[in-house]
Amino acid sequence: MLKKLFFILSKEDKNFLFFLLVFSVFVSFIETFAISLVMPFITLASDFSYFDRNKYLISLKEYLNIPVFEIIVYFGIGLIVFYVFRALLNAYYFHLLARFSKGRYHAIAYKVFSKFLNINYEKFTQKNQSEILKSITGEVYNLSTMISSFLLLMSEIFVVLLLYALMLLINYKITLFLSIFMVLNAFILVKILSPIIKKAGLKREEAMKNFFEILNTNLNNFKFIKLKTKEDGVLSLFKAQSEAFSKANITNESVAAVPRIYLEGIGFCVLVFIVVFLVLKNESDISGILSTISIFVLALYRLMPSANRIITSYHDLLYYHSSLDIIYQNLRQEEENLGEEKLSFNQELKIYNLSFGYEGKKYLFKNLNLNIKKGEKIAFIGESGCGKSTLVDLIMGLLKPKEGQILLDKKELNANNAKNYRQKIGYIPQNIYLFNDSIAKNITFTDAVDEEKLSKVIKQANLEHFIKNLPQGVQTKVGDGGSNLSGGQKQRIAIARALYLEPEILVLDEATSALDTQSEAKIMDEIYKISKDKTMIIIAHRLSTITQCDKVYRLEHGKFKEEK
């Protein structure tokens, strides 16, 4: 567990964790010292004659030159001040624990999200989006809870060890008896409850995965659900997983309460036994053992919550262990490390002996060859599923060929230059996603807007008249997924987005297939007009959209067939 946790934490986090562990030892010493001070206070307060029998106390009384009762009063005031200091120190320590454990949510969530954004495109397409959401939100939060439990476990162990040492010094026989009795009871508790907690943790993880899957799938198919009136079926699925998730948490919370209830009951019985034992042993005079009884009462009063927290924290480690495994595996994913090498595009884009197939599947293409001259307009057509979009992903440098090469001006596309190459490409997909922000932000993807460039692409995409009539202009919110806009308006924003970075290559992946024929023809004419100096690669179903292309290739059985 520690190996995985240290892999996840940064160097600064590990250093702070070490500091917290050292600090917890200091806090434990303060806790133990605070309890140990009670014994001399009660002893002296119950019998002033100690000040006449103990040479150190005689020296103290002579040095202070005040009545004994005043010394006791000042001792009591000092004890109160020390206990206030102890309370403040504990509050500060628990603040540090919370700041570290819950603060890791931000740091680890950022690392996991960053990792998913930086894996290669092919691996990302094989991921389940609901799994990604679950990891970044639920599992990271669970891990932060697990870190909190780990730190609490360690700090309470230090407290127990030091208090145990103190009790051994006072009366080792009673302490050893108490130890055997409590360890035996704790072992029984852990043995009985651990399998239940582990099982509940696995059920929680499975239910949470299904929970996110149902949410993700059905919110993305809301129109279909409404059309087919499938609300009851969806709610039934949701209810089943929601109940399973709740039941797992109920089991965990219920079992977590058992150690406290059990140990409190046992602790009280043990305490009564100790008092009775000491009284019977000293029938004639119990004043001499009053301080011993007091120290054991206070020690047990402090040990019971510690023992409960240790068992509860251990159960939390078991319950959330699957979250640690999931985050660990996510962070071990290999990142796509792209270099900063520059490429120029003055002559041609060449596909040479290209072969590709998704991992574990047959090759879609074998030995494809194609030359695309700079400024040329080409189109790919073919049946659905023949690999047109995959081919475009390869041309855009998102997928890596299994065999063969993609060359730009005779220079092979690779990890060193892929970043610069991708920046040369403007992409307009079939399914356009606009996030719930301003038109300007949806076009530029940044807060640092180049107003001149923005104005230029708005004109090129024929959005100027539409935006001028909006009360807030380019700052108008488009709604989630562009719900406040028509299909044509969303398409034009997508065109403006593709043109904003001034690409040399423009890729249209069935970009206008959702529009009616008239709107499609109008938008395609506009795209051709503003892309005279650009290389265009178009995937199309309707042949009417590619009449102005220089070449048209049909993709069939993994091979090209030139049709124009």
Segments (PLM) and residue ranges:
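Loop segments that connect adjacent transmembrane helices in multi-pass transporters
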Residues: T125-S130, E205-T251, Y319, L324-I327
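Transmembrane helix-loop-helix hairpins at lipid-water interfaces of multipass membrane proteins
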Residues: L21-F85, L168-K173, I180, I286-L290
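ABC ATPase nucleotide-binding domain helical subdomain, centered on the C-loop/LSGGQ "ABC signature"
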Residues: L407, A415, R422, A440-D480, ...
